[in-house]
From Swiss-Prot:
MF-aspect GO terms: aminoacyl-tRNA deacylase activity; ATP binding; leucine-tRNA ligase activity
Reactions mediated catalytically: tRNA(Leu) + L-leucine + ATP = L-leucyl-tRNA(Leu) + AMP + diphosphate
Keyword ATP-binding appears in the UniProt entry: yes
InterPro entries, per database record: aa-tRNA-synth_I_CS, aa-tRNA-synth_Ia, Leu-tRNA-ligase, Leu_tRNA-synth_edit, M/V/L/I-tRNA-synth_anticd-bd, Methionyl/Leucyl_tRNA_Synth, Rossmann-like_a/b/a_fold, tRNAsynth_Ia_anticodon-bd
Entry's family note: Belongs to the class-I aminoacyl-tRNA synthetase family.
EC number: 6.1.1.4
Pfam families for this protein: Anticodon_1, tRNA-synt_1, tRNA-synt_1_2, tRNA-synt_1g
Cellular localisation: Cytoplasm
Motif mapping: 'HIGH' region: 42-52
Gene expressing this chain: leuS
Binding site for ATP: K622
Enzyme class: ligase
Keyword tags: Aminoacyl-tRNA synthetase, ATP-binding, Cytoplasm, Ligase, Nucleotide-binding, Protein biosynthesis
Protein name per its UniProtKB record: Leucine--tRNA ligase
């Protein structure tokens, strides 16, 4: 081996070996335990960013470690290739989305290969390829035949900028999650998949995922939003109309003072027919923000409809109001309002001078003031006829029973979850495989017509969707009769909901999945991706797996056993203010810094000498120009150094702060490992290790080696605290660099230690370890080496160091045999010269011995 560590020479050579020998090709082998490790695939945006690098490094470390344990490891890769950014880039660059996408895939693939990830590239998937989405289209038609797909005109979240429908999950604080444009409500025909049919399974299944983060499971539970309540039907006075509400608090039923209905409720339209003021209010409410998150904070507005509902138990007439806090797509689109016991209803009632009627009082003697706020806790009933005095459960059941007997109510389990709207009005997506016949009937496209191929050679003008603009594209025939193809495309979450399963058989042409391959590899053993996907991708991912199970493709109930949500990558962000008062962000790579003695930034300047404002560590982003190009870092420091820093700088689930000084430190550490192996190689051990002939110092060093092996194995395998595993190896390296290499057994202990260090670092820094493994005299590549095992016997200590205290103050330390009893420890401790100074001529009151650690002598004159 050469004396200097040169990653620029080592890494290309090792990567070439891996590629030529298909080292990471996964083949089904029933004789071996499988391990499927998957990182969420990326959108091919053009260049890798450090968030990608972190995600895929974590996955690669886990995959390589599991392979060393002897498992048959699958780590595939692919591209979530449909989506809006391709259309925007195509318009901007005057190219086709397909061309832009495929160029990006090629470029990003080269970047990934530079980082040495052990992917099985033979299984590569791009979701925009017809051979992939053909089966998605086919599965959609099968779901339609099962009654799990339907089309309806509905009020949807519409982004006027992107001209597309957004799922509820894609509306953040009333704005589009992608472009931040205020979202409008619009009536549009949409295709839906009945995810609500699986709500109970999706909820219950969370209990079978002990290795998923609690936060993700909580977010999904809240998103599914199961509640038990009663659906109650009110007659509308002087009409034949009825209005249904759902409540989880039937105990408050006698306190209803008005009903609130959504602007899109049919009763609202009825009431507005001869009321222009109401019609204008309804239109305003329809166009308002629609995100559920806004409901708690937005101003409550309403208008009386002039209609009244009849309370089914009291006969009281209750005014019906259109209220902007009632949404048509949640529940029935109407609510019963109990101002005394619901804060939102209370605020609305106070604003519009509506009745506030108490029907619940605290169980304890607690003072409440219903002129100031609602009392929302459970309590006992008052002003509620025969139910007075009952607690929540008694009132719930009693009132529900009465309503059911009268035929105006029924117990019901409701979910906050809504069916999944999968239609998108964009071009760059998989065409929805449905046909409209001349008579207006809508039918699924037959299998022989699939895939319905999206034309890739198109011109984007930024105004019209090419397949909607081309009247000929939609024209087709079914059984010789004219028909029109659907021009909407699938939500891209469709593709990412089943890609993990297609990886098990990407070339399979006889069906959506090869059940034999799928059931060998699935479920995914380890899934890795950001927590921002908790209520979108990760919910659809679980839903699709249950659909695949019910279609007979897979036997497991859940798609992934274990989930790791990696933290974001942060970097310093710097800016100056332009003469027009605009913030101009400057890349951290161009900034010259001055720091104080604690390392804090006190001055930052750009190449022109301008003093910059340091806005702190923030998520790497284009908008703040603080992204660090992984490729530049690999070229400067080497892939192993970048990988090591990524795994060492922070626990995997926490945010990681990019510090180039830390990257430099990682490079220095690898240089030390290289140097130690080089020094050893100049005079290697010529005989094997003889553990019966070791000196005390050699035993101590060997004990440290095996304690480190045990810790690193647990940290990488069970705990997934990769940063502490690396810290343990660094600590061991400090001891190894000080160790003697004089005797043959010194060198034999060092040989064992270096073999262990190289194997422990291999999952994290595979290129350097590949080279060092050969330098240590191993004939086969480290890729086939077994994980190093800790020798339990080596970790047993012959001696213990006992701290000796006198009256709680340390007065000495003594070495005793590991199995020494208390009397022996006392004898040795009392003979210590320094201890004797403090106990001679003193009365020993008592002696406290903490076995193997501490002896405390309590004395008095």
């Amino acid at each position: 081996m050469q004396e200097q560590y040169r990653p620029d020479m080592i890494e290309p050579k090792v990567q070439q070996y891996w590629a030529e020998n298909k080292v990471f090709k996964a083949i089904k082998d029933e004789s071996k335990e499988k391990y499927y490790c998957l990182s969420m695939f990326p959108y091919p945006s053009g260049r890798l960013h450090m968030g990608h690098v972190r995600n895929y490094t974590i996955g690669d470390v886990i995959s390589r470690y599991q392979r060393m344990l002897g498992k048959n490891v699958l780590q595939p890769f692919g591209w979530d290739a449909f989506g809006l950014p391709a259309e925007g880039a195509a318009i901007k660059n005057k190219t086709a989305p397909a061309k832009w996408t495929y160029e990006n895939i090629a470029y990003m693939k080269k970047q990934l290969q530079l980082l040495g990830f052990g992917f099985d590239w033979d299984r590569e998937i791009a979701t925009c390829k017809p051979e992939y989405y053909k089966w998605e289209q086919w599965f959609f038609t099968e779901l339609y035949k099962k009654g799990l797909v339907y089309k309806k005109t509905s009020t949807v979240n519409w982004c006027p900028n992107d001209e597309t429908v957004l799922a509820n999950e894609q509306v953040h604080e009333g704005c589009c999650w992608r472009c931040d444009t205020p979202v409008e409500q619009k009536e549009i025909p949409q295709w839906f998949i009945k995810i609500t049919d699986y709500a109970e399974q999706l909820l219950g299944g969370l209990d079978a995922l002990p290795q998923w983060p609690d936060m993700v499971k909580t977010m999904q539970r809240n998103w599914i939003g199961r509640s038990e309540g009663v659906e109650i039907t009110f007659d509308v006075a002087n009409t034949n109309e009825k209005v249904a509400v759902y409540t989880t608090r039937p105990d408050t039923f006698y306190g209803v003072s008005y009903l609130g209905i959504a602007a899109a409720h049919p009763l609202a339209s009825l009431a507005a027919q001869n009321n222009s003021e109401l019609a204008a209010f309804i239109q305003e409410a329809k166009n308002a923000k629609v995100a559920e998150a806004d409901l708690a904070t937005m101003e409550k507005k309403g208008m009386a409809t002039g209609l009244f509902a009849i309370h089914p138990l009291t006969g009281e007439k209750l005014p019906i109001w259109v209220a902007n806090f009632v949404l048509m797509h949640y529940g029935t689109g109407a609510v019963m309002a109990v101002p005394a016991h619901d804060q939102r209803d209370f605020e609305f009632a106070q604003k519009y001078s509506l009745q506030i009627k108490q029907v619940i009082e605290p169980i304890a003697d607690e003072e409440i003031d219903l002129t100031k706020q609602a009392f929302v806790e459970h309590g006992k009933l008052v002003n509620s006829a025969e139910f007075d005095g009952k607690d929540f459960d008694g009132a719930f059941n009693g009132i529900a029973d009465k309503l059911e007997k009268l035929g105006v109510g029924k117990r019901q389990v409701n979910y906050r979850l809504r069916d999944w709207g999968v239609s998108r009005q964009r071009y760059w997506g998989a065409p929805i495989p449905m046909l409209t016949l001349e008579n207006g009937d809508v039918v699924p496209a037959p299998m022989e017509d699939l895939p319905i191929i999206l034309p890739e050679d198109v011109v984007m003008d930024g105004v019209k969707n090419p397949i909607k603009a081309d009247p000929n594209w939609a024209k087709t025939t079914l059984n010789g009769a004219p028909a029109l193809k659907e021009t909407d495309t699938f939500d891209t979450f469709m593709e990412s909901s089943w890609y993990y399963a297609r990886y098990t058989c990407p070339q399979y042409q006889n069906g959506m999945l090869d059940a034999e391959e799928a059931n060998y590899w699935l479920p995914v053993d380890q899934y890795i991706g950001g927590i921002e996907h908790a209520t979108m991708h990760l919910l659809y991912f679980r839903f699709f797996h249950k659909l695949l199970r019910d279609a007979g493709f897979v036997t497991s109930d859940e798609p992934a056993d274990k989930l790791l949500c990696q933290g974001m990558v942060l970097a310093d962000a710097f800016y100056y203010t332009s003469p027009t008062n605009e913030r101009i962000w400057v890349s951290p790579t161009l900034v010259t810094l001055e720091r104080d003695e604690k390392g804090r930034i006190i001055k930052a300047t750009d190449p022109e000498g301008r003093e910059l404002v340091h806005s702190g560590m923030t998520k790497m982003s284009k908008s703040k120009n603080n992204g660090i190009d992984p490729q530049e870092m690999v070229e400067k420091y080497g892939a192993d150094t970048v990988r090591l820093f990524m795994m060492f700088a922070s626990p995997a689930e926490m945010t990681l702060e990019w510090q180039e000084s830390g990257v430099e430190g990682a490079k220095r550490f690898l240089g030390r490992v290289w140097n130690l192996v080089y020094q050893y190689q100049q005079n290697p051990a010529k005989t094997s290790l003889d553990i019966t002939a070791l000196s005390a110092e050699q035993k101590v060093l060997r004990r440290e080696v095996h304690k480190t092996i045990a810790k690193v194995s647990d940290d990488i395998g069970r705990r997934q605290t990769f940063n502490t595993a690396i810290a343990a190896v660094m600590e061991l390296m400090n001891k190894l660099t000080k160790a003697s290499l004089d005797s043959e057994q010194d060198r034999a202990v060092m040989a064992e230690a270096l073999s262990a260090v190289v194997r422990m670092l291999y999952p994290i820094t595979p290129h350097i370890c590949f080279e060092l493994w050969q330098a240590l005299g191993n004939e086969s590549a480290i890729d086939t080496a077994e994980w190093v095992k800790a020798d339990e016997a080596a970790m047993v200590e012959d001696e213990k160091l006992i701290v000796v205290q006198v009256n709680g103050k340390v007065r000495g330390k003594v070495t005793v045999a590991a199995d020494a009893d208390e009397d022996t420890v006392k004898t040795i401790a009392f003979a210590d010269e320094n201890v004797k100074k403090f106990i001679d001529n003193q009365h020993i009151v008592k002696v406290i011995y903490v076995v193997g650690k501490l002896l405390n002598v309590v004395v008095k004159p």
